[in-house]
A protein has these predicted regions:
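Flexible coil/turn residues that form the inter-helical turn or adjacent wing/linker of helix-turn-helix
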Residues: 1, 15, 58
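Short glycine/proline-centered loop/turn elements that form peptide/ligand docking sites
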Residues: 8, 15-18
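Major-groove DNA-recognition helix of helix-turn-helix-type DNA-binding domains
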Residues: 19-35
């Protein structure tokens, strides 16, 4: 399946501007163009856009994303290095998830305190009426 940038944008949820930026940064390897020099997104290009979205959402720095792309361009002999980059990122994600879990619990406790206080205030106002 081959898609235009507009179709790729609709497929991935990325803006055409973001897709063009990714291409300028060299993050979409082997991107084809048609006879009019329009970008053509095949399944591999769409896969890269989806992966880049995932990596961005999970906080991988652009430099590390570029590293994965460059390693991929070098061929299968770099698969161990790509695994190492992704495992490092995954470990960072686990650390951040633990931090978020702790923060979430703290906020839940604070909300419970505020909601209890709010009920006490309502009860006090009702008693004064």
């Amino acid at each position: 399946m081959q898609q235009t940038i507009k179709e790729a944008s609709a497929h991935t949820g990325l803006s055409a501007h973001t897709i063009r930026y990714y291409e300028r940064e060299g993050l979409i390897p082997f991107l084809a163009r048609d006879k009019n020099n329009n970008r053509i997104f095949d399944n591999d290009a769409l896969h890269w856009l989806e992966l880049l979205t995932c990596l961005r959402v999970t906080g991988m720095p652009l430099a590390k994303q570029k590293e994965i792309v460059e390693l991929t361009k070098c061929g299968d002999e770099t698969v161990s290095e790509r695994i190492a980059v992704l495992k490092e990122h995954q470990a960072d994600m686990y650390r951040r998830q633990a931090e978020l879990d702790r923060a979430f619990k703290k906020i839940e406790k604070k909300l419970a305190c505020y909601e209890e206080l709010e009920q006490e205030v309502i009860k006090s106002v009702d008693q004064l009426s």
